[in-house]
Amino acid sequence: MSDTVVSLTASPAAIRHDWTLAEIQAIHDMPLLDLVHRAGVVHRAHNDPADIQRAALLSIKTGGCPEDCAYCPQSAHHKGANLPRERLMPVDAVLKEAAAAKANGAHRFCMGAAWRKPKDGPDFDAVLEMVRGVRGLGMEACVTLGMLTQSQAQRLAEAGLTSYNHNLDTGPEFYGDIISTRTYDDRLQTLEHVRQAGIGVCCGGIVGMGERVRDRAEMLLVLANHAPHPESVPINALVAVEGTPLEDRPPIDPLDLVRMCATARIVMPKARVRLSAGRKSLTREAQILCFLAGANSIFYGERLLTTANNEADADAELLRDIGVPVPEVTLAAAE
């Protein structure tokens, strides 16, 4: 084992914002059992291991996005994905879904709109009303709307938004292979607007798009050296959708997700590490290994924007089996 890793495993990780790429790669590449143990030690030093957040995710405006993200069926550039373009959902319909999610045990309600950036006007005003409504239900509220101005971020903060999702997707070197219509700096600027408004940052990425391990480490480096760390870090496995440029990418090894969850936990000890898209392909045992490695949030519900997710009953059973208290489901879906 390298001296770098030995020094990192001597005691639970402190909160740092000065990580190097070499350190993060060394952590990621540790023998798996050592890595999971190390991440578990850090996780238990900073978090309650029985506290696994359940977040629900709803697409409030689907399809027709002008961005060309290679993984996304919502892009207007990927005609073969055959995803219809829809208008923004009515506020009352969204809040009905939020109430159902809460009854199913969700703590947070996340809303995603397929926009490059929201325009000020009726649609943005409606999103603000959705945020206020979700907060009124006693839930955390998160939205992902694309790039934001500082003024828009401030208005979302005033509406009570808990967190804003704006993923980096991958490391800066590989980024240009995945998207050309928005720069890495564009993404970082939106994250800065969100921070300046006092909103929690939800930011992570996707593995399995053809990137190198170095690219994954570079993404974590960017996130871990932001101060403060993101409030939550979604770790997604690519869901290869027919009609997108990445439709033929093979599934990743589940242990790659375990390594990403563990590394994210070690370098960002207090962040919510969210096991996100692609979880449906994991066995119960692989998911439990991710929890041991420090994942402490999941998307709860049978769809994630446009892709399938685990059934709520199966998730509830899994969480109960590992000792996480989950209320009995009282409402399976919005009527």
Swiss-Prot record:
InterPro entries the UniProt entry points to: Aldolase_TIM, BATS_dom, Biotin_synth/BioAB, Biotin_synthase, Elp3/MiaA/NifB-like_rSAM, rSAM
CDD domains in alphabetical order: Radical_SAM
Positions annotated to bind [4Fe-4S] cluster: C65, C69, C72
Cofactor(s) the protein requires to work: [4Fe-4S] cluster; [2Fe-2S] cluster
Name of the encoding gene: bioB
Subunit structure: Homodimer.
Positions annotated to bind [2Fe-2S] cluster: C110, C142, C202, R274
Keywords: 2Fe-2S, 4Fe-4S, Biotin biosynthesis, Iron, Iron-sulfur, Metal-binding, S-adenosyl-L-methionine, Transferase
GO molecular function: 2 iron, 2 sulfur cluster binding; 4 iron, 4 sulfur cluster binding; biotin synthase activity; iron ion binding
EC number, UniProt record: 2.8.1.6
Function per UniProt: Catalyzes the conversion of dethiobiotin (DTB) to biotin by the insertion of a sulfur atom into dethiobiotin via a radical-based mechanism.
The Radical SAM core domain, residue ranges: 50-279
Family of the protein in this entry: Belongs to the radical SAM superfamily. Biotin synthase family.
Protein name: Biotin synthase
Keyword NAD included in the entry's annotation: no
Any one of the GO BP annotations: biotin biosynthetic process
Swiss-Prot/TrEMBL catalytic activity: (4R,5S)-dethiobiotin + (sulfur carrier)-SH + 2 reduced [2Fe-2S]-[ferredoxin] + 2 S-adenosyl-L-methionine = (sulfur carrier)-H + biotin + 2 5'-deoxyadenosine + 2 L-methionine + 2 oxidized [2Fe-2S]-[ferredoxin]
Cofactor mode of binding and number, as noted: Binds 1 [4Fe-4S] cluster. The cluster is coordinated with 3 cysteines and an exchangeable S-adenosyl-L-methionine.
Annotated pathway: Cofactor biosynthesis; biotin biosynthesis; biotin from 7,8-diaminononanoate: step 2/2
